[in-house]
């Protein structure tokens, strides 16, 4: 049965992607408000893929099934986030405007990848700083900030930036939570992100990711990781308005205390 679903789902998702590809077009030149857009927004409007409501539903359904069957399909997970997350992103936008830090992020639109971050400087920082902890996380888990997929299906360029920001900050959230990138760590982080951002894809990743845990992992998850994630997700401050790039030199434990984060006592 699972194989049959997979044979139906993958073509469905691919068909949805194929259907919308031909509608890609540059809209900036014909938009009278384009001159008020910043560089990120103008570039996004040139590269976005415009889709209809039906196509959005098709992509949402296909990508959700594909992501459930194979959580390693990051392309399907990314697609799911964009086709289901618009309402949550508008709520995040409101949160961004409630703080000076969040407002500056929306104006400056910083990016996190190897061409924008001086990783050599971060490596030289004291071990107890957030920047040093981030570099250590990347090395220990063999991940890179350059692996995030570009946003393509959101209509509003400001929401597209918020989704981009969420993706690029994912490893920073792992760092501040002191969670690895194994399945157990990812599920725990997804619960925190779900409660903190309200993004449907985070709830989906948390629920369906937990189903794939091995028996020993599931016991640890139910006894320790899930209660910890739910507590943190409910009590911590919003993470999206944090200007992480300005916190590199901050003591990582002081940053956690500021955000209301309690670390899990590893067992």
Curated annotation (Swiss-Prot):
Pathway: Cofactor biosynthesis; ubiquinone biosynthesis. It is an enzyme of class 4 (lyase). Its main location: mitochondrion. Keywords: Lyase, Membrane, Metal-binding, Mitochondrion, Mitochondrion inner membrane, Ubiquinone biosynthesis, Zinc. It is a peripheral membrane protein. GO terms for cellular component: extrinsic component of mitochondrial inner membrane. It is found in: Mitochondrion inner membrane. Belongs to the COQ4 family. This protein may be expected to contain an N-terminal transit peptide but none has been predicted. This is Ubiquinone biosynthesis protein COQ4 homolog, mitochondrial.
């Amino acid at each position: 049965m699972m194989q049959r679903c997979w044979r139906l789902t993958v073509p469905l998702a691919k068909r949805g992607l194929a259907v919308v590809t031909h509608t890609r077009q540059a809209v900036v030149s014909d938009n009278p408000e384009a001159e008020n857009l910043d560089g990120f927004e103008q570039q996004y409007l040139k590269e976005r893929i415009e889709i209809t409501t039906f196509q959005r539903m098709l992509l949402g359904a296909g990508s959700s099934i594909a992501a459930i069957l194979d959580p390693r399909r990051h392309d399907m997970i990314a697609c799911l986030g964009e086709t289901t997350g618009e309402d949550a992103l508008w709520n995040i936008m409101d949160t961004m405007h409630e703080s000076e830090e969040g407002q500056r992020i929306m104006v400056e639109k910083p990016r996190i990848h190897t061409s924008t971050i001086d990783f050599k400087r971060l490596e030289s920082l004291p071990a107890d700083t957030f920047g040093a902890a981030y570099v250590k996380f990347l090395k220990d888990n063999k991940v890179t900030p350059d692996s995030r997929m570009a946003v393509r299906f959101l209509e509003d360029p400001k929401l597209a930036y918020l989704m981009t920001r969420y993706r690029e900050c994912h490893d920073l959230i792992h760092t501040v939570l002191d969670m690895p990138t194994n399945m157990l760590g990812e599920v725990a982080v997804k619960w925190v992100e779900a409660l903190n951002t309200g993004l449907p894809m985070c709830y989906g990743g948390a629920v369906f990711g937990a189903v794939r845990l091995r028996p020993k992992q599931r016991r640890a998850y139910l006894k320790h990781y899930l209660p910890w994630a739910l507590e943190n997700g409910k009590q911590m401050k919003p993470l999206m308005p944090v200007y992480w790039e300005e916190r590199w030199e901050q003591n990582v434990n002081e940053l956690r205390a500021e955000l209301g984060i309690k670390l899990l006592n590893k067992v």
